[in-house]
Amino acid sequence: MSTTDTIVAQATPPGRGGVGILRISGRGAKDVAQALLGKLPKPRYADYLPFRDAAGATLDQGIALWFPGPNSFTGEDVLELQGHGGPVILDLLLKRVLALPGMRIARPGEFSERAFLNDKLDLAQAEAIADLIDASSEQAARSAMNSLQGAFSTRIHQLVEALTHLRIYVEAAIDFPDEEIDFLSDGKIEAQLNGVMADLDSVRAEARQGSLLREGMKVVIAGRPNAGKSSLLNALAGREAAIVTDIAGTTRDVLREHIHIDGMPLHIIDTAGLREASDEVERIGIERAWNEIEQADRVLFMVDGTTTAATEPAEIWPEFMARLPHRLPITVVRNKADITGETLGMTEVNGHSLIRLSARTGEGIDLLRDHLKQSMGFTSNMEGGFLARRRHLQALEQAAQHLVEGKEQLVSAYAGELLAEELRLAQQALSEITGEFTSDDLLGRIFSSFCIGK
């Protein structure tokens, strides 16, 4: 669709409410004001007046706000009509606006898209609007606001600027090879490159934490039947989310609970006990359990402490460990400490964390919560933090890889042309985050996930 049309959409959620808002953006916004209000309101002042139909009858009365472009959210002329929040009233107002020439309903996210296209905000800031609306915790909301205010974008621009300066030196070394000082071999370019790589690593670490805050950490509870997996799910969730009995194989399907630990979102998944299936239903449940394990960020390997004194995972269940995806982090949870009399606490066993607790009594659960936070590098103090999406992490990873390859070309062969190309590609990958180098297809996918009125 054309981005020069005048668009309209309801900016408040559907349903009944005290206030309902229509947002209009585009060259025809002033025509809407003249038609419904009889005048053009004073810019950026609230004006209380009737909203009229084509015959001059009052449809509603409320507040009109007029923002002439380019000093508006979208960079275009914008009119907001704030009336009563009844569905019928809003529908009448919407039909009235759409009856005027050149008006159409906005696509999802089109207001934010126009703001991006008119350089009112970059792509990372536009995405932060949707993240702010979807925030599931106070910390996520604060980090989304930081992103909206440019915290993430500023870090990216600093990296791009540093790469620009570095490219200048490299291009100079290529263009003037006969100069007395060889910039490629005197160590200065390598030192600058190392500095950029260190800064990029810092941003990547913050972005991973921002992604964790946005997406949540997927933790799968796995183990043999009757190890206490469902009891642990209930203890972490703080409610009876799963049925708990002494009958082996009670849990036959995947159970999911979404919880927060000091603002960190976690997706806790209880799975069927892993063993040789006794019937088709149990076989399907075990297959689903392994599917969840393979997609997990961390596995809590539940062990019934009354059945073994072993603490080494490979000794407890070698077949289970052999099937786990490579490098998938696991935490061994020795359950039923209230029965075995084991001392509660956490230790390290051959690179794996081991926690002794009682899911039934709740003893040791707080220790597990702290461990889950620490294992993902999460801190409750993220005042300057920002949210990040998977595409951001991918772009940062691509940029880092290009810098690694560029350094290899510099150190091994002083290949200036190849280094310059890797620097350019790294810069392009970073610019995709803010939207300076982004395909139209990607823009369409990003903004289509927004609300209609945003």
From Swiss-Prot:
Residues reported in the UniProt entry to bind (6S)-5-formyl-5,6,7,8-tetrahydrofolate: R23, E80, K120, K454
Record: residues binding GTP: 226-231, 245-251, 270-273, 335-338, 358-360
Any one biological process term the GO annotation gives: tRNA wobble uridine modification
Organism: Serratia proteamaculans (strain 568)
HAMAP family, sorted: GTPase_MnmE
Chief subcellular location: cytoplasm
Main enzyme class: hydrolase
Binding-site positions, K(+): N226, T245, I247, T250
Signal sequence region: none
GO cellular component: cytosol
Enzyme Commission number(s) from the entry: 3.6.-.-
TM helices/strands, residue ranges: none
Annotated protein name in UniProt: tRNA modification GTPase MnmE
Gene transcribed to yield this protein: mnmE
